[in-house]
């Protein structure tokens, strides 16, 4: 028992000296002398313990109740973190806490010797000095953008390339090499903008945009290269196709990409396909079809069923490639001369009723609604419903519609009949009043 007590006193002395040295060190760094009295109190407590002796229970209680104890000049919390004296912020490291305290005190010790810039953080001064030296160590992997700060690079990736930070493991070096090879293959294909490749598996697969079906008959190679797989497009055959590793850019950027690629195609490829020529063997169009609204389809089918007389030579065929019509157009000639109604939409494809097989040359075409009539009388009646200045304004009641679908639904709802009955009733009342 007599040998253990001096060892305990030596340990307490060393601990008190360590606390004193750390306190003076912190005071020299922060420039504050407010904790001198606390250090003297700790030293006085140490001398008293040397003179009067120190029993073990007092030391154990002071270490257990260390929530309010000053260590290194700062107050510690119950979990051992250093607590800020101005707010509830706590940190494990002293340097991080000192930087935080400078927010309250307004101290900015890190100053630029070339301009009046000053900051409380050393890393901010390092980033500022790069503006004087012109150094830009952070480079974007998708383009030639370079910057001097990491936060600017993250903002550039989110704003320019629509890349969101994904939680998970970082891609390995092999994935980075594979990504670089894919980017070279894509750039060799002549894209104006590079396709984004997500090295970590995304949460969902991006579906093919619907409006790209307008270019299905003109650029079949782009469809297979951009949407089936980039590895299949590259003739090396080194990379395997994995649909989860490909992330298509947003629709607007992809549309501009296809438009630029279309402008760079040869003249013979840009010409629209004639109805006599069949589809290319490599063409794999992803046209999504949907039946028209029930009311509109019934009205149009009735008009076509009632028409039996041949069309006059005034009918002019227009071989446009829009697939957003409630009635089928000559775009379906490439598949067996059988016209089917098709609407490019994001809904899954469903079978649609087929119209009687008839030569599109004999059909009358409404360019506003993209509808075809086999009878000249029905065509004339339909064209009389369009306004002169605004084709989507009803010529009967004057109702202005947004597009051809709203225009067709306007007649399907019978709004014109109700308006005509009201007008006739008003004219009758006026006649009776007179």
Curated annotation (Swiss-Prot):
Function description: Transcriptional repressor that binds the core 5'GNNTGTNG-3' DNA consensus sequence.
Q: Name one GO molecular function term.
A: DNA binding
Annotated Gene3D superfamilies: Classic Zinc Finger
Do you know which InterPro entries this protein is assigned to? Ikaros_C2H2-ZF (IPR050589), Znf_C2H2_sf (IPR036236), Znf_C2H2_type (IPR013087)
Record-annotated disulphide pairs: none
Compositional bias, Low complexity, is annotated for 296-313
Q: Per UniProt, what is the name of the gene that codes for the protein in this document?
A: ikzf5
Where are the compositionally biased (Polar residues) regions? 260-274, 337-349
Q: Chief localization class? A: nucleus
Q: Where in the cell is it found?
A: Nucleus
Please name the taxonomic classification of the source.
Eukaryota, Metazoa, Chordata, Craniata, Vertebrata
Q: How does it assemble?
A: Probably self-associates.
Q: Which family does it belong to?
A: Belongs to the Ikaros C2H2-type zinc-finger protein family.
Q: What is this protein called?
A: Zinc finger protein Pegasus
- Give the free-text miscellaneous remark of the entry: 'Pegasus' was the winged horse in Greek mythology.
One GO cellular component, as annotated? nucleus
């Amino acid at each position: 028992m007599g040998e253990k007590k001096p060892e305990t006193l030596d340990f307490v002395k060393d601990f008190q000296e360590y606390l004193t040295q750390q306190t003076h060190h912190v005071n020299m760094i922060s420039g504050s002398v407010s904790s001198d009295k606390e250090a003297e109190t700790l030293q006085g407590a140490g001398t008293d313990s040397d003179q009067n002796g120190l029993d073990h229970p007092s030391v154990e209680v002071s270490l257990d109740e260390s929530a309010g104890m000053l260590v290194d000049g700062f107050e510690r919390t119950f979990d051992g973190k250093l607590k800020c004296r101005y707010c509830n912020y706590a940190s494990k490291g002293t340097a991080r806490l000192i930087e935080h305290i400078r927010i309250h005190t307004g101290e900015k010790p890190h100053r630029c010797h070339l301009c009046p810039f000053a900051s409380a953080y050393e890393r901010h001064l390092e980033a500022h000095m790069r503006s004087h030296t012109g150094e830009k160590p952070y480079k974007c992997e998708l383009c030639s953008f370079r910057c001097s700060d990491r936060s600017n690079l993250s903002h550039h990736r989110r704003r320019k390339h629509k890349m969101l930070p994904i939680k998970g493991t970082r891609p390995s070096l092999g994935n980075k090499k594979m990504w670089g090879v894919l980017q070279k293959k894509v750039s060799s294909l002549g894209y104006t903008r590079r396709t984004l490749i997500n090295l970590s598996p995304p949460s969902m697969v991006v579906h093919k945009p619907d409006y790209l079906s307008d270019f299905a008959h003109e650029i079949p190679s782009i469809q297979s290269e951009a949407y089936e797989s980039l590895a299949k497009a590259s003739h090396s055959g080194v990379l395997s196709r994995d649909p989860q590793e490909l992330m298509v850019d947003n629709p607007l950027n992809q549309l501009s990409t296809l438009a630029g690629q279309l402008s760079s195609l040869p003249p013979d490829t840009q010409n629209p396909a004639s109805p006599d020529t069949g589809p290319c063997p490599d063409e794999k169009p992803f046209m999504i079809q949907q039946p028209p609204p029930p009311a509109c389809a019934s009205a149009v089918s009735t008009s076509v069923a009632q028409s039996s007389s041949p069309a006059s030579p005034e009918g002019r065929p227009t071989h446009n490639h829009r697939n957003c019509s409630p009635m089928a157009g000559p775009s379906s000639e490439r598949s067996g001369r059988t016209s089917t109604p098709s609407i490019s939409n994001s809904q899954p494809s469903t079978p649609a009723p087929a119209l009687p097989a008839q030569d599109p040359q004999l059909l009358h075409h409404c360019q506003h609604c993209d509808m075809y009539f086999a009878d000249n009388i029905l065509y004339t009646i339909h064209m009389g419903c369009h306004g002169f200045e605004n084709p989507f304004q009803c010529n009967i009641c004057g109702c202005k519609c947004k597009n051809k679908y709203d225009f067709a639904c306007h007649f399907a709802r019978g709004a014109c009949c109700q308006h005509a009955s009201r007008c006739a009733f008003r004219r009758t009342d006026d006649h009776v009043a007179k």
